[in-house]
């Protein structure tokens, strides 16, 4: 697989996990650009879930016709090669902007 890119939805294994972190084989929204991901073998991403709970940092979207939430408060840096990330979809620019806005608020970025 070529390096994942910003806005890609990839499926990968989140285990091992600890505490309240998402676990198992699940989708994630890629937040870092392909150039970084290719060079480092890492990617910055937010896990996704079909269990929508209405939390303030969820961003609702659809992937393959399934409603799901991007968990923008659980941002991670993961080795996409070792975790065998597979691209399944791409989100809209609007969804990316919404997730980026949530991350800015969470991290108190200007």
PLM regions with names:
Residues 1-110:
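Conserved functional hotspots at enzyme active or ligand-binding sites that engage polyanionic ligands
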């Amino acid at each position: 697989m070529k390096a994942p890119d910003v806005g890609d939805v990839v499926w990968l294994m989140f285990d091992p996990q600890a505490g309240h972190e998402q676990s198992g084989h699940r989708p994630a929204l890629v937040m870092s650009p392909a150039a970084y991901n290719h060079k480092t073998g890492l990617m910055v991403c937010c896990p996704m879930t079909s269990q929508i709970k209405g939390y303030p940092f969820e961003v609702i979207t659809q992937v393959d016709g399934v409603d799901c939430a991007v968990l923008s408060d659980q941002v991670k840096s993961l080795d996409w090669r070792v975790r065998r990330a597979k691209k399944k979809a791409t989100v809209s620019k609007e969804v990316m902007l919404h997730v980026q806005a949530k991350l800015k608020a969470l991290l108190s970025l200007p």
